[in-house]
Amino acid sequence: MASGLAEESELSPGESELAVNPFDGLPFSSCYYELLEQRRALPIWAARFLFLEHLESSPTGVVLVSGDPGSGKSTQIPQWCAEFALARGFQTGQVTVTQPYPLAAMSLASRVADEMDLTLGHEIGYSIPQEDCTGPNTMLRFCWDRLFLQEVASTRGPGAWSVLILDEAQERSVASDLLQGLLRDTRLRNLPGDPRVVVVTDPALEPKFQAFWGNSPIVRVPREPGGDPTLAYKDTVPTDLVEAACQAVLELCQQEEAPGDVLVYLPSEEEISLCCESLSGEMGTLAVPGPPPRVLPLHPGCAQAIQTVYEDTDVSVRKIVVTHWLADFSFSLPSIQHVIDSGLELRSVYNPRIRAESQVLRPISKCQAEARLLRAKGFPPGSCLRLYSKSTLELEAPPLPHPKVCEENLSSLVLLLMRKQIAEPGECHFLDRPAPEALMRALEDLDYLAALNDDGELSDLGVILSEFPLPPELAKALLASCEFNCVDEMLTLAAMLTAAPGFTRPPLSAGEAALRRALEHADGDHSSLIQVYEAFVQSGADEAWCQARGLNWESLCQARKLRAELVELMQRIELPLSQPAFGSEQNRRDLQKALLSGYFLKVARDTDGTGNYLLLTHKHVAQLSPYCSYRNRRTPAQPPTWVLYHSFSISKDNCLCIVSEIQPEMLVELAPPYFLSNLPPSESRDLLNQLREGTAEPPAAATETSSPQEYGDGCVLQ
């Protein structure tokens, strides 16, 4: 495709001073031409016309693009697709780019808006959780892939698409893998506009995607010219990775012959924070010429602060960027000259057999190691220090990243598949098929939640559950709150449970600990979360107020946005709201009932009175989290006998997280009878069955009627 539009973008200021931007009709700014020179220097620029030809003529409507990190794929391909759509007048809709991480979608939208000389939030936009920066004239949108999948499966969405770009497909996110499966299935290739599809990946996964997509054309981005980085290994893995990484950074900073920015890879956010804190303390006293280096974290918790990584500073100020797997393929930083790679990642892996997640510290893949090495490739080539041995990489590292669809709870995935009217989740094409046990467990959980009817199809309740950007059990609890007249409190709780953790981890000062303790509620962790949120709102969302109590201000702001989004969704699907009643005895019981309606699968009983909890659904013993409000009270008290928990971790702490006391009579009342019958043999099951047999009449608490609703009408979940 050699359109006039494509030729226009080759112009320089000297060639046409009157050139106008075809997307908004305004003259190009001088900044546009400066960025155009940088774009032309990217390795992918050489493949531009080949890509446009394949996009025009692909027999399958699909184009594969394979290239190294930093080659310009994520910024240039969306612009070329926008040119393609503009040449057709955007007759079939906008261009949408999916990203595996919300922060990447936001960051790329900002960069592409600058390069195209357009306005962010107008022609160029992004959609991430709790933030929709788009407008009616948005023609190029960057979107978190899970949010886009939710749009495709539900009644929401912008309408139609000219081109759909699945970027960073090698990350193997659940949403990206499922979108490819749905798009490959010709029965489901009925998205509005019948969009062209572009799948962008790393060369290591090119054969896998090529086999999956058949005879679709592929565009291979040439590797950036220049020497390879100097590569060094450690003979053994250090016992303290943070200390070893800090030491390596300090040594680099003291070498005059090693200028340039540094990228440090550590396993987890906790280690990133420790490393940044340690390095920041050292930099002020470091004997180096010029200003001290600037230490910057890069992880999902950074939120809007992520853009500071890209801010132009004095070239004499060295940047030390400390990150983890987030920057394996995303967030290319051209100024990086040196990489320090720990070779490890901390990931959450779901075990469907016991419905629990574990934090697994494991070696990165060979593909990730190569991507990290290439971050230091350039003019002149930099260096890469691997804090592990070459034999460790060769013998212990898997060749490719682990597909997330084989490691996550699949309940939400199966719910979406059912929404797309796939009779059996097993019928969907997967790049890597999940274990049958994981799919069956997801179906079982959805059946317990009444999301499926007697024929195994999605029930009316299941359709409503699929509309919510929440895990199915939390969505069910929110719907149940309509019946129990505690919607206001449950909306707050759903937002707090979904947003990033609102508490900073100890150690806290004595003053911070005392102020935080004052926010704890006697009814348990769930009520404490509601109390924290309400106090935060009453403070005027004051950041200093949060810091004084060891609270994460950005997480609480995120929860506030999510709550507003949930309120809007409840109103759109005409579900009733309720007036606030938090703190009353009736509201306490109603909130417990709503929670149990969704979380009856997550109940445990203290079997010996010492805090050893036996999980109801399987014979596994756990303890309360060290951060649980029941353990942090000034006056020691006997732990509650029966508890409902939000999550269970079988990692090093083996604990129940976010816990509240419940009454077993309430569990018998609200859990499906066949669920109680299917519990494994235990004393807890016997006690519940005795309660069920001895309560032909509802218990006293259950016979009490809620006060009449003052706002909206109630609903009853069948």
Curated annotation (Swiss-Prot):
Keywords assigned: ATP-binding, Nucleotide-binding, Nucleus
Residue window of motif DEAQ box: 167-170
GO MF entries: ATP binding; ATP hydrolysis activity; helicase activity
SUPFAM superfamilies tied to this protein: P-loop containing nucleoside triphosphate hydrolases
Gene3D superfamilies named among the record's database cross-references: 1.20.120.1080, P-loop containing nucleotide triphosphate hydrolases
Keyword Transport listed: no
Residues engaged in binding ATP: 67-74
Tissue: Ubiquitous.
Job description of the protein: Might be involved in RNA metabolism; it is missing helicase motif III and may not have helicase activity.
Name of this chain's protein: ATP-dependent RNA helicase homolog DQX1
Organism: Mus musculus
Lineage, broadest ranks: Eukaryota, Metazoa, Chordata, Craniata, Vertebrata
